[in-house]
Regions:
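N-terminal domain-onset segments
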Residues: 1-54
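Low-complexity intrinsically disordered segments
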Residues: 52, 57-188
Length: 188
């Protein structure tokens, strides 16, 4: 995956600059042109909307490689049965992490960093957790490969127009950036 290091650098820069990273997706087409969408996710409905916009944008722009990165909570796996019902954000042994995940038709990769903060919530350091990279890379919930541009399967113009229409009512929830974004903000 050609752009993994570039996206990893961007994710680390964002958390150092802003202190947090919203759910972000970056897609690349066959010519290496990129587009990026992100939003603050508050609930499951937001996740669904983000997933739909991500899928549509990958399809419309024939993405052949994509990356997702975000900060969140990871819990220890040695919890007993009663603790399993606790949401990760409420688990006292939770760890804040920055996850960067990428996928192309042939490969997938992930990098996990434990986020270390001081009492004032300022970022102190990002500790690479190489022991978790493979587990995250193989997590089926992370995969969106069906949305990538498949060289054997081309989306028709009709498919793309249908997806553009589905994305049109959601302009207010996504922020688009880039000097020349592939995506037209009016459609998203």
């Amino acid at each position: 995956m050609k752009h993994f290091k570039q996206v990893l650098t961007e994710a680390r820069r964002m958390i150092r600059q802003d202190g947090d990273v919203s759910l972000t997706a970056v897609g690349f087409d066959a010519n290496g042109r990129a587009f990026k969408i992100w939003m603050q996710v508050e609930n499951d409905k937001d996740k669904e909307r983000f997933g739909m916009a991500m899928a549509g944008n990958f399809m419309v722009h024939s993405a052949i490689e994509y990356y997702v990165f975000f900060t969140g909570w990871m819990v220890t796996l040695d919890r007993d049965e009663t603790e399993l019902k606790t949401r990760p954000s409420k688990d006292p042994r939770r760890r804040e992490v920055l996850i960067v995940y990428g996928e192309s038709p042939d490969e997938k990769a992930a990098q996990v960093y434990e986020v270390v903060r001081d009492a004032g919530e300022r970022l102190l350091e990002l500790k690479a957790r190489d022991d978790l990279d493979e587990m995250v890379a193989n997590n089926s919930q992370m995969r969106f490969a069906g949305m990538l541009g498949d060289t054997k399967r081309k989306h028709t113009q009709e498919d793309r127009e249908r997806m553009r229409k589905m994305l049109k009512p959601m302009p207010e929830i996504f922020r688009i950036y880039g000097p020349e974004p592939l995506i037209n903000p009016a459609l998203n």
